[in-house]
Amino acid sequence: MLFVKYFMLFLILVASVLLGKNIARKYVNRLKELEEMRTALNIFRSKVSFTYSPIPEIFGEIAKDSKGNIGKIFSVASKKMEKVTANIAWSEAINEVDSNLNKEDKKILENLSKLLGQTDVEGQISQIDITQKFLDNQIQDAIDEKQKNEKLYSKLGITIGLAIVVVLAWNWLWWIDFVPWERDDSKNGYKFII
C-alpha cells in the first residue's frame, strides 16, 4: 500500500512538471514559428521578384522547404488557390492551421492577403516588406515573452507539483501511517499511543 502511495506522488510530480514544461514550450514554439515565417516570406519575396512564378507554385515550393506549421500554412494556401483567389486562400490557411501563433500574429499575416495576387509585383513586394517589419516587432515581443515566461512556467510546474506532493504526503503518509494517534470513541477524540 505504501508503494502505491509513493508511486502516485511520483506520478503527480511528473505530471505537474510536464504540464509546466508544456506551457513553457508554447513560448519557444511561437518564436520558432515567427522566425520560420519570416524566412518563408523572404523566400516568397525573392521568388516573386525574380522568377515571376505563379503564387500557388511558389507557395507549394515554400511548403516543401518549410517545416512544421509554417509549411502547413503554405501547403494549405497553395491547395486552396485551386478553388479560390490567393488572398482568400492565404487568409483561410492562416486561420485553419493549428499553430502557436497568437491572434495578433495571425492578424499581421492576414494583412498580407489584402494585396496578394491583386496587384503588380512591386505592390506585392511592398506588402511583403511591410508584413516583415511587423513580424520583426512580433519576433522581438516573442523573445521577451519567452525569456520572461519560459522559466516561470517550468519552475511553477515543479513548485506546484512539489506542493501537492507535500500536502498529500502529509495526509497520506505522516498522518495516517506514522502518527501514533488512535481514535478514542469513548471520548470522541484521539489519544496518544506510546
Label the predicted regions:
Residues 25-32, 104, 123, 151:
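A structural signal for alpha-helical segments
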Residues 7-19, 141-172:
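Bilayer-spanning, highly hydrophobic alpha-helical transmembrane segments
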Residues 115-160:
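Membrane-interface, cytosolic juxtamembrane amphipathic helix immediately N-terminal to a transmembrane helix
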Residues 2, 8-79:
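Juxtamembrane/interface alpha-helical elements of multi-pass membrane proteins
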